[in-house]
Each structure stands twice: as C-alpha cells, then as structure tokens.
Amino acid sequence: VAGVNLRRVFFVAVGGTVGTAARLALGMLLADAGVVPVLVANAVGAFLLGVLTARLPAATDLRLLLGTGALGGFTTYSAFMTGTLSLWADAPLLACAYAAASLVLGVGGAALGLRAGRPRAGGRA
C-alpha cells in the first residue's frame, strides 16, 4: 500500500497485542474489583507513556512498539466509558468520582512519568 510503512504498522500491531493481553490479565487478576482494573491500567499506562515520551524520540520503532502499540493496547478509553456508564445507572455520584479520579490519575501519572523519565543533572536518570 503506497504511503503506508508496513514495518511501523507491524510494530504497533505486535505492541497492541501484548498490551491488550496484559490489560486482560490485569482484569482477570482483579475480576471482582469493578472498575478498578481499568483505573489502574490507565493510571499506570499514563505514567509509562510519560516516561517513554521523555526518553524516546517520537518517530522511533521502539516508541511505536511500546507507546502506541503496547501502552495504547494496555490503556483503554472505551472500557473507561463503559465503566462510567455502568456506575451511572446505580450511583451517579460514584460515576462522577470515578471519571474525575481517572482524569486526575491519568494527567498526574503522565506528568510524573515525564518527570521521572527526564535525565537529571549530571546526565543520569
């Protein structure tokens, strides 16, 4: 296909498969925890995306594999929305708290990841 870099598509697909499988495993481990597995996956994923953003140039194959692929598959907006709507039916206040916590943990995790991933004085992280 003209204009499509199939090697990069492959890296994203492989990473996405691994990330999605990891999220499924997390959900199985915390099966009785309601929306907690999605909250954990999104917060941890945001932190790790922050670290990757600070550490790896945007156009590298490794960043595509780990960031767009693996962490893109590990984190999930659709499950976040499904969980929010599920909570809304019986507990609208809890749904709002979950949505707010997801936003705060996501942005906070990404900011902490960026900070953790940046080299410190002396060139070492």
Segments and roles (model prediction):
Residues 1-125:
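Membrane-interface helix-loop junctions in multi-pass transporters/channels
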